[in-house]
């Protein structure tokens, strides 16, 4: 079957409700520095992933930490293809009509994780609004396959919102729940129309709360990117909403514009302010908070989960 058409950059954002005025990316402040890739390890890991026909969000979303994570032989695996059914203008993953789920992907994923001897993995996906359960059943199949091959490996999932199919999705995840459930709110509710067309703030909170109700012993986690025009008070209000919905773990990081056709960065939050947010999060009762310019939801996820469990 031929590869489907992938829209990125201007082709992706041209049909969303707001108009993106192309802007050159701002000069980065001195505190934002990604580590240069360790080329032998990066090439080796990419080779393993391509041979297994797997994708990583590290590559598809142009994550600034790719060099560091690949250099350590770790990655966040992206299942269900590399085409998203939505057009979020902050994200660098391509938009298009995806292929049906690959029935061999759970096996390929499990074999690759076993080959790499990973102790902690993050599994994420694009939005799959074309599937009746939003892809949750495929998540469960992947979790079960990994556990069969690597029973000691801990598994975190970073899910889409399963909007319009939440009950089906949660029922599917009941078959093979993860060790950590992560779903990112991404930004404050005032900015949802601009940053997350097709998503709903209250629905995302409900997903996290409903999963927690069904699996009270499994930690829940969420994250936001800062720099899209939100205020500090709005961030604190979202943090309070997350705690009110039983979320245990928090990540806050700096939004970086993938290209001139994506949403512009409106401010760079200082490391000192991130440190204050982290202290405020812990005071609210989060079991763990990772807040910093280069923090991403799956960055050092194993360390976050271990710290939360110890706390």
Swiss-Prot record:
Source domain of life: Bacteria
UniProt key word Iron: yes
SMART domains found in the cross-reference section: Elp3 (SM00729)
CC per GO annotation: cytoplasm
Catalytic activity: [[Fe-S] cluster scaffold protein carrying a second [4Fe-4S](2+) cluster] + N(6)-octanoyl-L-lysyl-[protein] + 2 oxidized [2Fe-2S]-[ferredoxin] + 2 S-adenosyl-L-methionine + 4 H(+) = [[Fe-S] cluster scaffold protein] + N(6)-[(R)-dihydrolipoyl]-L-lysyl-[protein] + 4 Fe(3+) + 2 hydrogen sulfide + 2 5'-deoxyadenosine + 2 L-methionine + 2 reduced [2Fe-2S]-[ferredoxin]
Cofactor: [4Fe-4S] cluster
Disulphide bond pairs: none
Cofactor stoichiometry and binding remark: Binds 2 [4Fe-4S] clusters per subunit. One cluster is coordinated with 3 cysteines and an exchangeable S-adenosyl-L-methionine.
Span of the signal peptide: none
InterPro entries per the UniProt record, alphabetical: Aldolase_TIM, Elp3/MiaA/NifB-like_rSAM, LIAS_N, Lipoyl_synth, rSAM
SUPFAM superfamilies for the chain: Radical SAM enzymes
Domain Radical SAM core as annotated: residue spans: 70-287
Binding site for [4Fe-4S] cluster 2: 84, 88, 91
GO molecular function, one term: lipoate synthase activity
Location relative to the cell: Cytoplasm
S-adenosyl-L-methionine found in the keyword field: yes
Keywords: 4Fe-4S, Cytoplasm, Iron, Iron-sulfur, Metal-binding, S-adenosyl-L-methionine, Transferase
Positions bound to [4Fe-4S] cluster 1: 58, 63, 69, 298
Family statement: Belongs to the radical SAM superfamily. Lipoyl synthase family.
Protein name, UniProt field: Lipoyl synthase
Protein encoded by which gene: lipA
